């Protein structure tokens, strides 16, 4: 379903640590983080017609938005409301999800961690480097990837989860599109479900996700991984992604998954060409209107090569850090990365400078 109005906070700025004021004149708080905004972009959409205008927060509250008033007000409430903890993890500061690919064909590190013990050791190393969440995946969903049979995926990820759970209290996320893998991973101690299809690939995944009671990360992707980047089409990629994620959030809530347990991922690189990815990256703050935390996964992805001519994924760390910082500056709560230590250092320096404090 297509929305009629969207609201994007712009001019986001850091709030000094300890500031308590929350009036429109000093800006409004962004999702409970030490970030504020005093200007919004109002986007009106009717079919193919899209109109955009900027307004100060104070002006927006003083004027009549006509038939959009109620809808815009609900979006503003979603943008300013603090986010619930994710499996016990507070989201008042940016959090790091470390990637553990137990696959032979991942685009970045395929085959490096394909044995269970090597993957467990790698995951524990990411935890030591500062990861808040460990994301375990046994099926590559890179462009062109083939579907992995469920038994093979289980054989890859279950020994890793079972090997990790007794050795760490770190949050464990299972990156899968399959209901059987979700169910087995949850029983083995996984804390979060991360589905690149937003619970659409497997007809049973929505009900199984609800049964587990675990938080769910819903990602936008256009098409199947094997063909998704051949010819993606959008009316407006930024708004279309919003509409898709909002529809999946509604479907989850209808299935019995509380909205407070959902996270939205706009799906950088999934059914998107460079101009699509850049547009989404530049408008991440719009997705706060969904009323759930935002996860950004741009680490080592092809868009970095397209922008800066870096063919090898392992050489894309600087571009990955730039993408992560661009995200957290727009209020993204979670960054999914390969290079945890470098990301942690970059975020610590950014926070210290942005908030004029060394309490990172």
Where are these regions (language model features)?
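Catalytic domains of carbohydrate-active enzymes, especially glycoside hydrolases
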Residues: 121-137, 330
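Active-site-adjacent loop and "lid" segments of alpha/beta metabolic enzymes
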Residues: 1-34, 91, 107-122, 141-164, ...
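N-terminal accessory interaction module
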Residues: 1-87
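Glycine-rich, aromatic-flanked loop segments that form ligand/cofactor-binding clefts
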Residues: 83, 89-97
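Short acidic capping loops at alpha-helix termini that bridge into adjacent secondary structure
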Residues: 258-261
């Amino acid at each position: 379903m297509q929305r009629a109005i969207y609201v994007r906070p712009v001019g986001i700025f850091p709030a000094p640590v300890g500031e308590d004021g929350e009036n429109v004149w000093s800006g409004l708080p962004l999702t409970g983080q030490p970030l504020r905004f005093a200007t919004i972009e109002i986007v009106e959409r009717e079919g193919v017609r899209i109109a955009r205008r900027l307004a100060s927060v104070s002006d927006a509250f003083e004027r009549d938005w006509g038939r959009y008033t109620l809808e815009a007000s609900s979006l503003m409430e979603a943008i300013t409301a603090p986010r619930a903890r994710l499996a016990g993890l507070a989201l008042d500061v940016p959090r790091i999800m470390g990637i553990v690919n137990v696959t032979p064909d991942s685009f970045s590190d395929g085959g490096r961690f394909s044995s269970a013990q090597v993957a467990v050791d790698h995951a524990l190393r990411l935890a030591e480097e500062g990861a808040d969440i460990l994301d375990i995946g046994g099926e590559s969903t890179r462009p062109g990837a083939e579907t992995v049979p469920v038994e093979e995926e289980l054989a890859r990820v279950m020994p890793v989860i079972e090997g990790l759970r007794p050795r760490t209290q770190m949050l464990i996320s299972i990156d899968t599109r399959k209901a059987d893998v979700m169910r087995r991973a949850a029983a083995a101690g996984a804390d979060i479900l991360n589905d690149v299809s937003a619970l659409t690939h497997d007809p049973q995944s929505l009900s199984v996700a609800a049964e587990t009671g675990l938080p769910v990360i819903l990602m936008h992707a256009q098409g199947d991984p094997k063909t998704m980047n051949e010819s993606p089409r959008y009316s407006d990629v930024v708004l279309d992604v919003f509409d898709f994620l909002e529809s999946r959030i509604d479907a989850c809530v209808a299935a019995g998954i509380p909205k407070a347990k959902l996270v939205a991922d706009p799906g950088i690189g999934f059914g998107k060409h460079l101009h699509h990815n850049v547009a989404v990256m530049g408008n991440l703050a719009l997705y706060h209107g969904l009323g759930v935390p935002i996860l950004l996964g741009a680490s080592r992805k092809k868009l970095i090569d397209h922008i800066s001519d870096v063919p090898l994924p392992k050489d894309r760390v600087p571009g990955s850090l730039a993408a992560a910082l661009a995200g957290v500056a727009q209020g993204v709560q979670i960054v999914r990365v390969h290079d945890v230590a470098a990301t942690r250092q970059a975020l610590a320096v950014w926070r210290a400078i942005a908030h004029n404090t060394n309490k990172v």
